[in-house]
Amino acid sequence: MKHRIYNKAMYQFDSPEDSLWEATPGNRSAISQKLLGDQISDIAIIGGGYTGLSTAYHLAKKYNITSSVIDAGHIGWGASGRNGGFCSMGGTAESINTLIKKYGLEDVKKYYQCQIEAIELVRKIIIDEDIDINIQGKAEIEVARSSRDHEVLASYARFRQDVLGLKTNIISRDDFAENYFDSTEQFGAISVEPTFGIHPLRYAIGLADAASKKGVKLYTNSEILSWNKTPKGHILKTSQGSILAKNVVFATNGFMPEHLLSSFYSRSLPIISSIITTRPLRQSELDDHNWKTDDPIINSRKLVNYFRMLPDKRFLFGGRGSSAGDMNGARKNYMYLEKIMKKIWPHWKNVEIEYKWHGFVCFTSRLTPSIGRLDNDPSILFGFGYHGNGVNTSTWTGYQLAKIIGECDKSNQYPDDMPNMVRGISEKFPLSSLRRYYLQFMIRMYRLRDSLEMSSK
């Protein structure tokens, strides 16, 4: 595990995360098996999450091209089965103004139009494939934790609507308290459409099932130990088998085994994100904070929290965490999240937390997704770096990778509708061995700024 950024506890591929999602997975009907013996496939996809499954699904559906998906764990073992279930706009950690300076207004507008299309793509797959998911909400809410934050958010909402053409709404503090919820950190909000919440693991399993029915082979609990290029093609070896493929799609995102190929070394920065969920809340407890919304929500803290009320009235609350990925660090992250949650909603201070889990979100050095072919080997494709908005962005990325394979020649040609800001591989992070440490420093600084801002409110 020397090649991994975090503690080995983050990479226990044979152990499911102890999450609410794993406890309620629905019907696991997709046919999968370990990779045994020597197999052959035109296209091998490393990663059984949304990116890899979407690539395989769209290759089969749109181009009648079959492929093989290989994952070190089970389907949805990584971020695809651990996230908060926000199907919302984002995919970048860069400010819109900076994006416009770098790529131009038209490309940024194209990107956000693609984000809307990505959300609707997820909705279409869920409906078309009859995936057992209760879609919740219609907008993402960003709630202000101070009156100053509300002014900033309102200006941001007007910009996104007037310049980017997004559907936004500005909500006053009183309106929000009456129609959404009330708390100690509620000074109004903004909303942006479309957005909805899902059961993320059920979506991954449903996507795998749909791909499997179209002829995609699913190999699970099959960690790739080596990757070599030969005149016959790429050979991916596991402990009990191998697969020979003409093309490889690298779709592992935050759990990227970057040691397998030097071209991917230090291209990503995985960041721990932790989630806690309560027991189902009683109606009287919901009334204590006048909770009325099922929209996915984030707050305006520097170290953003994300939260939503689930269909069974459990409350999900998440945020970024600073640790080495060991169990002691995880416990500290969960305790910190619970402390913040119960500070914001004090009437819930005695509500029990029933599930706690964590995983990775994936950043790139340019703070936008990284999608395409390797310049030095166009038979290798990749898609990663969704910055905490992977449900829709990774599904769309898989669709784009399928189009590259199905429609573009083996050069650097990209689909016309793919924005420039996501094309090609991102630059390497500097001082790669120190990535986790300067990340920890950044998170501590953000937490300090959040505390100072609240004390001066």
Regions found by a protein language model. Name each.
Residues 41-69:
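N-terminal Rossmann-like FAD-binding beta1-loop-alpha1 element of flavoenzymes
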